[in-house]
Amino acid sequence: MRHRILFFFLAFIGISQFVTSSDVRNKYNFNSDWLLNVGDVPEAKQPRFSDSEWKKVTLPHAFNEDEAFRLSIDELTDTIMWYRKHFRLPADSKNKKVFVEFEGVRQGADFYINGQNVGLHENGVMAVGFDLTPYIKYGQENVIAVRIDNDWNYKERATGTKYQWSNKNFNANYGGIPKNVWLHVTDRLYQTLPLYSNLKTTGVYIYAEDIRVKSRKAIIHAESEIRNEYNRDKQVSYQVELIDRDGTSIQTFEGTKAVVKPGETITLKAASEVDNLHFWSWGYGYLYTVKTSLWVDGRKVDEVATRTGFRKTRFGKGMIWLNDRVIQMKGFAQRTSNEWPGVGMSVPAWLSDYSNHLMVEGNANLVRWMHVTPWKQDIESCDRVGLIQAMQAGDAEKDCEGRQWEQRTELMRDAIIYNRNNPSIIFYECGNESISREHMIEMKAIRDLYDPHGGRAIGSREMLDIREAEYGGEMLYINKSAHHPMWAMEYCRDEGLRKYWDDYSYPYHKDGDGSNSYKSTVTNKVQKKVDARVYNRNQDSFTIENIIRWFDYWRERPGTGDRVSSGGVKIIFSDTNTHYRGVENYRRSGVTDAMRIPKDPFFAHQVMWDGWVDTECPRIYIVGHWNYNDTVVKPVYVVSSADKVELFLNGKSLGNGERDYHFLYTFKDIAFVPGKLEAVGYDENGKECCRTQLQTAGKPEQIQLSFIQSPEGWKADGADMVLLQVEVMDKDGNRCPLANDLIHFEVEGPAEWRGGIAQGENNYILSKDLPVECGINRALIRSLTTAGNVRITAKADGLKSAEISLTSSPVEVKNGLSSYIPGDELEGRLTRGETPQTPSYKVSKVDVGIVSAIAGANNENTVNSFDDNELSEWRNDGKAATAWITYKLERAARVDEVCMKLTGWRMRSYPLEIYAGKELIWSGDTDKSLGYVHLDVKPVLTNEITIRLKGTSKGGDAFGQIVEVAAPVANELDLFKAKDGDKTGHELRIVEIEFKENLLK
């Protein structure tokens, strides 16, 4: 098959002479009327097989959804199951092309149509498509059957190779068809689908170039791969229409005509400059619809509508620009399953929006989907809510070779083709561990081939010394760079149950109490933990830890020197049915629980992250609640970006808080008195800039119910859901923060109770008896395929009961097909507004450059301590007399601060003296850290600074529970696993050093 490329550029609007035709493609919702059987039934591929006893389901639907959060990840059932569906095509589909698109199956699947095998798909992650045209029976019933095996140890049939990402740590095994399925009916001259898996086609590619943000202009490009499956030549014209979010057509332009031979595949292109554009941005999900159409003899024969957005990016100098404004990455490393109790990952599109927009509400700007490619539904959701994404392909905790590496490159290729029109994807990630330079170059070539104009950086975790990477960053440590940006990929692994406020509150869980052992999903054995505290925190200490850990990255933000941190993502947003170390059988590192009820750290991040780099909107939050016994005297913690915070109790000032880590204010020994606790923040001029309060609630009196649902209403398609929120309130309608009452629910009408989660037997999964925790809980309720009114009643001992009703609306399904496309009517959210045109940060520090250095030993390696490479170091020879190094500066300066990354940063405290010329400007022991130490020195005019070890450094790990899943290796510069890494003698070892002048004295 030949492949040609035709291109035509129009700088102005094209004037179309075409006549609109209705003879265009149809996209059908193919989720309805599926039948499910758990177990291998080989005869099920035959169309006449009797499936009348099989379970009726609406997709997306994992066969083991009931196990989500009831079982730990490694216990999720893996087996063989079959899905079948009976359907008929409309009469006008005859002589057309018919394709089926599965957004994903888990893990390996054989596909049959009317008894004929049409293909195999095995990676368990990506979408796959099949051409059903040769097998379709027009005017008759058709049967599609899918045999799926979700074995944890599934191996590729042709090679016997296991997929690296089929992993019991991070990739929750919700087996079957947990994603959407679509049916496409097109003309025989058509634009292909972006389904390289099996179909080997690339579809439509939309992108912008020459973006001028201030003048709102760009050149919009469209490219469509088209194929002619007629038995004669076709002369084709190509047209592009750009439609804004209000449905207004703002520009139409055309490409050249082309003659496409039978069986030929070509690519048509067109481009035009467009004015008055709205650029997609953080918290500004402005999307356009781009309609690309094919015309023959003045008749439209095919049209594809692509929903996309346009934005400008740049990566360099250790920083990231979005629409010409520097942005520091602040967000979450979320499990790609993004799962919920009782249903797993298979939720409606509006609920994906609810969850993902909650990140934006918390002022996150980035979600890093972990280890495998995210579901298309989540990708499109992030487009709508304005949340930047890092898109993985597939991996585990290490680089690999041979067929496993080929599996990774193939998945990256397919994922890029499928998702390259989604503006929220700004990063392509090639691995959850460093990959080789050769592998990085190979992945980069894939990006350059299939998405050369998308404005996306491609990189991998680590990549500290591989300049071909366009971004990188470690998992737990602080990295800085003056070349490609570095952001931390999974910081702060601590866990805390939402139920536990603090030591002083019911149920009086002591901070850190929990088992000192857990079942490792790596070894499948029970392992001892030296210290369980960080995995069983109360909410107050969990919040403080999150503040401390973010401060490490904020301190190195753009504007603080030449080498900066581009931020980081905290590991997981919502509690997850994956690898855990705490008491419960699921991970509780989220800033929300699994039902997306915020914990205190959610609001702490909302305070700290409200700005592109520097804080732009002062905020304040009091950690915890204000309902205690009269004898309680406790610290009160306030999170604020204000310069000073004052606390008031019932109008009386309790003074100003003690400030730590820039954002944390502590008020010690506050005696509880019922009433109103207020915190007021002041700016540097003493003017009030933010205020918040807590109010003591009365005794529990009543239950309150409310719904959270789609803006489209509740659809009776068997897949749509609503969130039922239940709260225990006092007589005045205030939530009771210590209520943990068991609520008994009754459901009447066409609905299925999927429930919520709470601490207790089986985590209360699917139970209609569900306790509130801290006065609140939520439950999922799924529609049936019958519409009607649903009434829910909630009762509890000693509380006034409540009831609430909701009516589901019918969804038309005819012969297994529906024109209702969930998510199509969901609008982009514009909550943060367009990208500001003001600078995102003030320059607070400038570096004084280093010209050269001499040392007591290893002079040839002194440059390693200022080479912008955190995998190199200078070290002396271990003798006291050689434990010094002198740096010559590019100019005489009054240095205010010395910033260093010292080898063994988490293990060692170095006793140092620092001299400006011969004058001592600092003496002391450096702190242990997760990266850099900052030493405020006496500012003395000099062009020469000496660092000298003044004694034996002190060893011992200060961060023993901050560890990865995979074991670190002994030769890493943190010395965490090095033999005698904490025994340093007279070693002086420097990874990077910087000398800074403070401009904000």
Where are these regions (language model features)?
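Extended carbohydrate-recognition surfaces in non-catalytic/accessory domains of CAZymes
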Residues: 22-103, 158-170, 174-177, 185-189, ...
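Beta-strand-rich structural segments
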Residues: 222-226, 293, 636-639, 680, ...
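Beta-strand-rich binding/interaction modules
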Residues: 215-258, 634-653, 676-681, 740-743, ...
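Accessory beta-strand-rich segments of carbohydrate-active enzymes
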Residues: 28, 40, 78-197, 388-390, ...
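Disordered, acidic Ser/Thr/Pro-rich linker "stalks" and the adjacent N-terminal cap
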Residues: 51-60, 113, 823-895, 901-907, ...
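Active-site-adjacent substrate/metal-binding segments within catalytic domains
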Residues: 61-89, 93-102, 106-114, 119-122, ...
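Substrate-binding/catalytic cleft of secreted carbohydrate-active enzymes
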Residues: 298, 353-359, 365-601, 605-608, ...
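Glycine/proline-rich low-complexity spacer/linker segments in large multi-domain proteins
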Residues: 118, 138, 143-185, 279-291, ...
